[in-house]
């Protein structure tokens, strides 16, 4: 996201609205009755959220999804799910906003840790193997380099997504790796979905980042069949 040419290093919290705009502006090029979306990682959760509000979306696939609002508010595996823990996060981020204003620049939170500690959790090692190697490194990638700005996730603390995912009538396919640390996001999301056009597909042996780029693991045939069926 850029304003006046200077990057904010912040996620677009209104991503579901952006997806809805695409559904509108692409109608001159595509069939408005056959709109499908795919979201990966954090955008997977946002894609489901978009499907909850935009009835033009007929099929949604979320790959190795994150619920960014949940992990921000509760920490990984909900280990920080308390009012006090959230208060401390708010306090720290709001204090940083004042510092950023005084400095005239955003402090960055840091991307994937480098060098990688020997005792790093396996999912951090998996991220390193993607973002810090030719697999996924890019000079402008925030995760590969300085990361998002420290205060960028503040609104996520106060804006839980997926609140009305149980009302999605269109088709949803959730795909997650068996060994992914983030698997619980898809499992929770699936438990809230209703209707026989919803599916959770667990890929045996796969971790979180395998579904980013591993061509022999990503279930392309399943994705093709899913969109073919529901975008007819």
PLM region spans:
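Alpha/beta-hydrolase-fold enzymes
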Residues: 48-130
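Alpha/beta-hydrolase-fold catalytic nucleophile elbow
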Residues: 38-40, 61-64, 203-204
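Glycine-rich nucleophile elbow surrounding the catalytic serine of serine-hydrolase chemistry
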Residues: 39-49
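Catalytic histidine-centered segment of alpha/beta-hydrolase-like enzymes
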Residues: 206-217
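Short beta-strand/loop motif that positions the catalytic acidic residue
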Residues: 168, 174-176
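Active-site nucleophile elbow and catalytic-triad environment of alpha/beta-hydrolase enzymes
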Residues: 69, 75-76, 146-164
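Catalytic nucleophile-loop/oxyanion-hole region of alpha/beta-hydrolase
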Residues: 1-36, 217-219
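Conserved loop-alpha-helix segment in the C-terminal half of the alpha/beta-hydrolase fold
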Residues: 178-199
């Amino acid at each position: 996201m850029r304003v006046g040419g200077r990057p904010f290093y912040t996620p677009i919290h209104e991503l579901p609205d952006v997806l809805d705009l695409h559904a509108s502006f692409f109608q001159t090029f595509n069939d408005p009755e056959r709109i499908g979306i795919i979201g990966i990682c954090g955008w997977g959760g946002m894609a489901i959220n978009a499907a909850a509000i935009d009835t033009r979306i007929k099929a949604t696939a979320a790959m190795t999804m994150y619920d960014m609002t949940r992990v921000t508010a509760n920490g990984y595996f909900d280990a920080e799910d308390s009012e006090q823990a959230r208060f401390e996060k708010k306090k720290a981020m709001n204090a940083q906003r004042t510092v950023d204003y005084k400095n005239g620049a955003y402090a960055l939170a840091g991307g994937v840790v480098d060098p990688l500690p020997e005792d790093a959790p396996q999912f951090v090692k998996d991220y390193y193997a993607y973002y810090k190697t030719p697999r996924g490194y890019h000079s402008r990638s925030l995760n590969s380099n300085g990361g998002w700005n420290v205060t960028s996730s503040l609104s996520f603390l106060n804006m839980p997504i997926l609140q009305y995912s149980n009302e999605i009538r269109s088709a949803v396919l959730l795909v997650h790796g068996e060994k992914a640390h983030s698997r619980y996001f898809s499992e929770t999301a699936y438990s809230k979905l209703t209707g026989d056009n919803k599916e959770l597909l667990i890929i045996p042996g796969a971790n979180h980042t395998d579904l980013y780029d591993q061509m022999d693991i990503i279930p392309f045939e399943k994705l093709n069949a899913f969109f073919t069926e529901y975008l007819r």
